[in-house]
A protein has these predicted regions:
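Alpha-helical interface subdomain recognition
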Residues: 1-103, 115-120, 127-132, 145-148, ...
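A short, Trp-centered hydrophobic/proline-enriched beta-strand micro-motif
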Residues: 131-139
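A short core secondary-structure module
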Residues: 160-161, 165-210
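Short Gly/Pro-enriched turn/cap motifs at secondary-structure boundaries
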Residues: 101, 128, 143-146, 170-173, ...
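Flexible, small-/acidic-enriched active-site or ligand-binding loops
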Residues: 150, 203-234
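Short glycine/proline-enriched turns and hinge-like loops at secondary-structure junctions
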Residues: 78-79, 147-149, 173-178, 191-194, ...
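Flexible, glycine-rich active-site loops centered on histidine and acidic residues
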Residues: 109-115, 137, 149, 189
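Short Ser/Thr-interspersed hydrophobic loop/turn segments at strand-loop and sheet-helix junctions
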Residues: 63, 87-91, 184, 200-205, ...
Length: 400
């Protein structure tokens, strides 16, 4: 494996480019676990589209299902850089498992931590951080993806309860979650200002989650449709207040994009590792192909993308640790890292030649798994519009 050499230099604003001893320990723990428990069965799980319940349980025992959850709520109380290195190491081994973790941590736990009441935090975070419960994030609908301000799922107040009806689509962890954060419109006349978020326990009558099959990648992760038919949710399970739902969703997506970007760094690292190993072992014309200039060019391009993506992720994590606005930096990291992961996987397949087209080597899986990173948590095009807004001061997609 190619291990990045730490750069012990302070940036002008105090950001450091080397990991702390604690962060290095977390990286090594995650790497050892990934190489021992995740990598050996990744191909078979992908072939069988089999969700790894056993591995998720072991990650829970390590504390890796709640790394950034404060200790008082059952988590490890780590910072965002430590979270990033966990996602990177797990993503290098199997993006399906990294996706499960990202949804659990970035979209579910962090949303409750940032927006929940004290009672909600104490009720749900310990169960999520331990892995006793898995969570999911129900925003996308069959006809609503990037335009999250126009939800069709409805929530109507009935005494001390809200009654929710609607459907959600492409929900990671949806079929295995015990808790869903569901976004619904309380008053269509208010448009995005009428959206609210609800904590829905999935054993509630009227809730179902049929699994979606036939995905290009992330085959051993669970993806489902959420169907809510007269689902009654206690009023105290609203997350935040009416009108805050859209803001909660956008805030959560910042955390989600950070997780995706971190996992994509892992994919790129995996592509570099696999390509260097193969190029050093494969011979042609009487020498290892690693000595050919055009093969080195493919690998060098991957290394450049790896270093750039990792630094963008760490920059976003640094700002998140400081508690300052980071939407711009998180979008930059997600945009660059996801597209770079696709480029790296294509280059890695090219290095491997015909073998790269077979699942005998991991690089074809890296490509299939990388592609979805350019789509979920906001497409590449949405990230460009976000960056364009910061550059020009004009919001091309502001809710009307």
């Amino acid at each position: 494996m190619t291990t990045p050499a730490p750069i012990k230099v302070d940036a002008p604003d105090g950001m450091r480019f080397d990991l702390s001893p604690e962060q290095e320990m977390i990286r090594q723990t995650a790497r050892d676990f990934a190489e021992r428990e995740i990598m050996p069965g990744a191909r078979d799980r992908d072939r069988e589209a089999r969700f790894p319940h056993d591995i998720i349980a072991k990650l829970g025992k390590l504390g890796f299902l709640g790394p950034t959850v404060p200790e008082e709520y059952g988590g490890l109380g780590l910072d965002y850089i430590a979270e990033a290195v966990i996602f990177e190491e797990i993503g290098r081994a199997d993006s399906s498992i990294r996706t499960t973790l990202s949804v659990q941590i970035s979209l579910t736990e962090m949303t409750i931590l940032h927006w929940g009441t004290e009672a909600q935090k104490r009720k749900y975070l310990p169960k999520l951080a331990s892995g006793e419960w898995l969570g999911c994030f129900g925003l996308t609908e069959p006809g609503v993806g990037s335009d999250a301000s126009n939800l069709t799922t409805r929530a109507v107040r009935d005494g001390d309860e809200w009654v929710i009806n609607g459907r959600k689509m492409w929900i990671s962890n949806g079929g295995i979650a015990k808790l869903a954060i569901v976004f619904a419109q309380t008053d269509p006349a208010l448009k995005h200002k009428g959206i609210a978020a609800f904590l829905v326990e999935t054993d509630t009558p009227g809730f179902s989650a049929p699994t979606i099959h036939g995905k290009l990648g992330l085959r051993s992760s669970n993806t489902a449709e959420l169907v809510l038919e007269d689902v009654r949710v206690p009023a105290e399970n609203m997350l935040g207040n009416i009108g805050q739902g859209f803001r909660i969703a956008m805030s959560a997506l910042d955390d989600g994009r950070f997780g995706v970007a971190s996992g994509c760094v892992g994919i790129i690292q995996g592509c570099v590792d696999a390509s260097v190993k193969y190029a050093q072992e494969r011979t042609a014309f009487g020498q290892p192909i690693a000595g050919f200039q055009l093969v080195q060019e493919l690998i060098a391009d991957m290394v450049l993308d790896l270093e750039a993506a990792r630094l963008l992720v760490y920059r976003a994590g640094y700002l998140k640790n400081k508690g300052v606005p980071n939407t711009r930096e998180t979008s930059l990291a997600k945009w660059y890292a996801s597209e770079a992961a696709v480029r790296a996987a294509l280059n890695a397949i090219q290095v491997h030649g015909g073998y790269g087209y077979s699942d005998e080597y991991p690089v074809e899986r890296y490509l299939r798994d990388a592609k979805v990173a350019t789509l979920y948590e906001g497409t590449t095009q949405i990230q460009k519009l976000i960056i364009g807004r910061f550059a020009t001061g004009i919001d091309a997609i502001a809710p009307k």
